[in-house]
């Protein structure tokens, strides 16, 4: 049976070092059998961030890729927290935020970058 690490390799995803929190909080906390994840940003491996409002400063596809990047960062934090991603049974809740220009209404299309990664 393939592992999550195997699947990440198939997708050419290498988990980065988990991004350092930008404030007085931790990236993840385990309570019983649940792991609660703090909000994560669009930290790129070079330390910069994906920024801008959809669709003015970045395209809907760029927002999708940014949400996917957040998912990769969260997986890195989760792996650091629990050691083995195969221990994860289910993603219980996702709260995604999109910086968007007035009138933009297709927020789910961006957040799907995260959701699709979790499904993959």
Where do the model's predicted regions map?
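Short, polar/acidic, helix-capping and beta-turn segments at strand->helix junctions
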Residues: 1-120
């Amino acid at each position: 049976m393939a592992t999550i690490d195997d699947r990440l390799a198939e997708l050419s995803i290498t988990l980065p070092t988990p991004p350092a929190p930008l404030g007085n909080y931790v990236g993840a906390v385990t309570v019983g059998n649940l792991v609660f994840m703090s909000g994560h940003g669009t930290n790129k491996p070079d330390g910069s961030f994906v920024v801008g409002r959809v669709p003015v400063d970045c395209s809907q596809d760029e927002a999708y890729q940014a949400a996917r990047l957040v998912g990769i960062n969260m997986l890195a934090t989760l792996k650091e927290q629990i050691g083995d991603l195969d221990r994860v049974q289910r993603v219980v809740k996702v709260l995604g935020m999109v910086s968007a220009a007035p009138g933009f209404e297709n927020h789910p299309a961006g957040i799907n970058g995260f959701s699709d990664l979790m499904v993959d």
